[in-house]
């Protein structure tokens, strides 16, 4: 199985299925059908079965899926059967919101270091993690064996931060700066431009009105 051939939309839906299975498991439900999953996340049962089929056979025909087993398989597929060391650079309003988001730790993304250049923020503590100066980024990220870097700095500084993260050996970057970053092919890059997402929404709303 070559992961690169898996549609990105399928990976996104697997994450949604995983969250739904977490809720279902908390309710004490032992087995679940593709129809139940579909109803819970807003897709068709056929789509659920197709997404899971990329990764093998799950469940029993006429019975459904064991909730815990299916959830465990999906977590493994998503790489969430382990914890990930994450560093965050940029402690503005967005950075603060990201560092205090409990969902990261619940999913295995552990923010082990935080960096900023503001003297008033350096030395403060957020969720038990001290804010360090950016000039210590490479040193600390290497020491922590950081695997993922989150960039939430202004656009003019984003490439410099990306270069530092790459030098420190991070394997993936989540970039919130609205700028195109240059990274080597072995580094996974995901850009999140909130304005672009809002523009997609306004386009879709406008299309419906037309």
From Swiss-Prot:
DNA-binding region: 16-55
Cellular component, GO, one term: cytoplasm
This protein's UniProt keywords: Cytoplasm, DNA-binding, NAD, Repressor, Transcription, Transcription regulation
InterPro entries (UniProt xref): CoA-bd (IPR003781), NAD(P)-bd_dom_sf (IPR036291), Rex_DNA-bd_C_dom (IPR009718), Tscrpt_rep_Rex (IPR022876), WH-like_DNA-bd_sf (IPR036388), WH_DNA-bd_sf (IPR036390)
Keyword NAD among record annotations: yes
Subcellular localization(s) per the UniProt record: Cytoplasm
Binding site for NAD(+): 90-95
BP term (GO), one: negative regulation of DNA-templated transcription
Top-rank taxon: Bacteria
GO molecular function: DNA binding; DNA-binding transcription factor activity
Main location (coarse class): cytoplasm
Disulfides per UniProt: none
This protein's record includes keyword DNA-binding: yes
One Pfam family linked to the record: Put_DNA-bind_N
Family from the record: Belongs to the transcriptional regulatory Rex family.
Biological role: Modulates transcription in response to changes in cellular NADH/NAD(+) redox state.
Name the record gives this protein: Redox-sensing transcriptional repressor Rex
Organism in which the protein naturally occurs: Desulfitobacterium hafniense (strain DSM 10664 / DCB-2)
Name of the encoding gene: rex
